[in-house]
Amino acid sequence: MKTLLLTLVVVTIVCLDLGYTRKCNKLVPLFYKTCPAGKNLCYKMFMVSNLTVPVKRGCIDVCPKSSLLVKYVCCNTDRCN
């Protein structure tokens, strides 16, 4: 009976698929946030004039194209930005 109960609990957890969400760094990389559903990429935004210091980090659904003034770097693993 205990085995059956344990099996049911495991199957329930697997079927519910508690969901995996991406974790992305905030502007200060010591801190991160859990991304909302659908935002599966992390990004860093730089000013082209200074590519060493990011001005924004976070979660995003689609990586924006870089422009003459702003460069975006996107990745798809936890805290990769």
Curated annotation (Swiss-Prot):
InterPro entries: Cytotoxin_Cobra, Snake_3FTx, Snake_toxin-like_sf, Snake_toxin_con_site, Toxin_cobra-type. The keyword Ion transport does not apply. GO terms for molecular function: toxin activity. Keywords: Cardiotoxin, Cytolysis, Disulfide bond, Membrane, Secreted, Signal, Target cell membrane, Target membrane, Toxin. Residues 1-21 form the signal peptide. Its main location: secreted. It is found in: Secreted; Target cell membrane. Disulfide bonds join C24-C42, C35-C59, C63-C74, C75-C80. It comes from the Eukaryota. The keyword Membrane applies. Expressed by the venom gland. GO terms for cellular component: extracellular region; membrane; other organism cell membrane. GO terms for biological process: killing of cells of another organism. Shows cytolytic activity on many different cells by forming pore in lipid membranes. In vivo, increases heart rate or kills the animal by cardiac arrest. In addition, it binds to heparin with high affinity, interacts with Kv channel-interacting protein 1 (KCNIP1) in a calcium-independent manner, and binds to integrin alpha-V/beta-3 (ITGAV/ITGB3) with moderate affinity. Belongs to the three-finger toxin family. Short-chain subfamily. Type IA cytotoxin sub-subfamily. Monomer in solution; Homodimer and oligomer in the presence of negatively charged lipids forming a pore with a size ranging between 20 and 30 Angstroms. This is Cytotoxin 4N. It comes from Naja atra (Chinese cobra).
